[in-house]
Amino acid sequence: MESKQLHSIIGIWTNACRFLLAAVFIFSGFVKAVDPLGTQYKIQDYLEVFGWAASVPAFLPFLASVLQAMVEFCLGVYLLFGIRRRMTTLFVVLIMGVMTPLTLWLALSNPISDCGCFGDAVTLTNWETFGKNVLLLIAAVSVFKWGNRITPLVTKRFDWLVAMYTFLYISGMTLYCYRELPVFDFRPYHIGADIRKGMEIPEGEKPTVYETRFILQKDGVEKEFTLENYPDSTWTFVDSKTMVKEQGYEPSIHDFSIIRQEDGEDITDEVLDDDNYTFLLVAHQLSQADDSTIDLINELYDYSVEYGYQFYCLTSSPDSDIEDWQERTGAEYPFCLMDDITLKTMIRSNPGLMLLKNGVVINKWSVNSLPDEYVLTDRLEKLPLAQINEKTFSHKVVLVLAWFVFPLLFFSMVDVIWEHFHRKKKLKENRTK
C-alpha cells in the first residue's frame, strides 16, 4: 500500500515539476524570441563583464540570443507534451546546472543588476534569480530522475509534428521580430507611453542624480565636459557617458536627454512639450546603421518640413560618423546626441523611427517598415498611423496564441481521434479471431 502511495506521490510531484519547468522555459524563450536584439545586448553585457567582448566576433552575440530563445522555448514545449523525455530532461538539467552557479556568482558580485532571464517582461534582482534557479534545478533533477513518470500528451506517432511546428513557430517569431519590431514591447518607450510620466518621481522620494559627460576632441587632444561647461563648435564630439552621482529612486525612464549636436543645447523639454507631431530617427551607431532606406528617410524629412513637423536624428555617434553619414546619404535633418543605452531601449532597430506628440509615443517603425509616400498622403492629423491603436496589444495576444495554440490543439485532437480508431480497429480484429 505504501509503495503504491509513494508511486502516486512521485508521479504527481514529477508532473508538477514538469509543468512548472515547461511554463518557465516557454515564457523565458518566448520573451527572448520577441526581442532578439535585447537579448543580444544583454549577452554583450556579460561578455564585457568577463572581458571577452573584444575577442568575440560581432555576429556571435546575436546568434547566441536566437539559439537561446529557440532552445528554451522548444524544451518548454517538449516538456509540456512529454516529447523525447530522456533527452529533453537531460538538456534541462544541464542548462540549470550551468545557470544556477552563474546566478549565484552574479548575486554575490553584482556586476549586472538584472540577469535578463525574462527579458524586459519581468525584472528580477540577482538574488531573486538565484532563488528561482535553485527551485528550477530541484525540479529539473526530479524530472530527469523520474522521467518515465511524465505522462505524454501526444503519442510518438504525432510528437514529431508538435516538435517540428514548435521549432518553425519560434524560428519565424524570432526572425519576424528581428526584421520588424518586437511583437510585445515591454520597455518604457512602448506605443502609448507618456515619456514625461515615465520620468516622474513620486512625492517624497529622492531622485537619483546623474551626470552626463561628453568626450570631445580638438587639435588631437581629448577632454571631458559636462552640460555646464560644454565648449564651442570648434571641438569635435567623440563619445558620451552617463554616470550615477548619487543613487536614489529610479523611474522607468531616467536618462532621456536630447542634446543638439550643433551647439550642445539641451532641447529635451522642447521636444517633449511640443503639441505638434515630432519625428525621431533613432540610430544609436551611425557606422553600423542600415543605409538601404536613405532615400525614404530623406523623403520623410521633406514631408515633415512640408507640413511643419519637427524631425531629429538621435545618435550617440561621434562627429566623424555623423559627417560621414551626411556625405553618404545627403541628410539635411538636424542631429542630436543621446545616451547609447537609451537609444537601444527606445527602439530595436538601427535606424528606427519614432513619432511623438506631447511627449507620448504615437507610433514606431523599424527600418524595414518605414511609412512611404503611399501612406503619407495627407497631414498626420488625418492619417490612422498618427493615432494610437488601443486594440493593438489585445489583438496581438489573440493572434500569437491562435498561431501557436490552435495548431497544437489540432495535432492533439487528431492524435486522440487516430488513437481511438486504431484501438477500436484492433479490438474488432481481436474479436474476429
Regions found by a protein language model. Name each.
Residues 88, 289-295, 393, 397, ...:
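Juxtamembrane interface at the cytosolic side of transmembrane helices
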Residues 97-150:
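Membrane-embedded alpha-helical segments of integral membrane proteins
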Residues 212-220, 351-365:
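A short, hydrophobic beta-strand/beta-hairpin element that forms part of a small beta-sheet core
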Residues 246-248, 254-259, 268-288:
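Short active-site neighborhood of thiol/selenol oxidoreductases, capturing the structured segment around
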